UniProtKB/Swiss-Prot annotation:
Signal sequence range: none
Keyword Ribonucleoprotein: yes
Organism: Granulibacter bethesdensis (strain ATCC BAA-1260 / CGDNIH1)
GO terms, molecular function: mRNA binding; structural constituent of ribosome
Record's protein name: Large ribosomal subunit protein bL12
Gene name for this UniProt entry: rplL
Any one GO cellular component localisation term in the record: cytosolic large ribosomal subunit
Cited Gene3D superfamilies: 3.30.1390.10, Single helix bin
InterPro entries: Ribosomal_bL12, Ribosomal_bL12_C, Ribosomal_bL12_C/ClpS-like, Ribosomal_bL12_oligo, Ribosomal_bL12_oligo_N_sf
The UniProt record lists the keyword Ribosomal protein: yes
């Protein structure tokens, strides 16, 4: 045990350059590398996401179907989008069409509620 204590004292007294040289000599002698092992991450399972998905912040409101009260839906579309009468009518009659893009969740829900009150079918994506 005295020899080990003596060895520890000798190693502790080495300079950084001497310690690096000792490390290289031991690597060559033992045929090993002092490089830190790199952990390989396991691949995610087939159905699992690699990282948690970010919560969506921008939504698109889509008019799926105008319903029976087309005139009321056209009026609401004009109010929501600022479109003219002809453009709003074309949007309603050409459903499914995008009403508004890049809106926050609250605004998308509000638009959906207003249009559904007029009998329209609305989707939020």
């Amino acid at each position: 045990m005295a020899d080990l204590s003596n060895l520890v004292e000798q190693l502790s007294s080495l300079t950084v350059l001497e310690a690096a040289e000792l490390s290289k000599l031991l690597e060559e002698k033992w045929g090993v590398s002092a490089a830190a092992p790199v952990a390989v991450a396991a691949a995610p399972a087939a159905g699992a996401a690699a990282a948690p998905a970010e919560e969506q912040t921008e939504f698109t409101v889509i008019l799926a179907k105008a319903g029976d009260k087309k005139i009321n839906v056209i009026k609401e579309i004009r109010t929501i989008t600022g479109l003219g009468l002809k453009e709003a009518k074309d949007l309603v009659e050409g459903a499914p069409k995008t009403v508004k893009e890049g809106v926050n969740k609250d605004e998308a829900e509000k638009i959906k509620k207003v249009l559904e009150e007029q009998g329209a079918a609305v989707e939020i994506k």
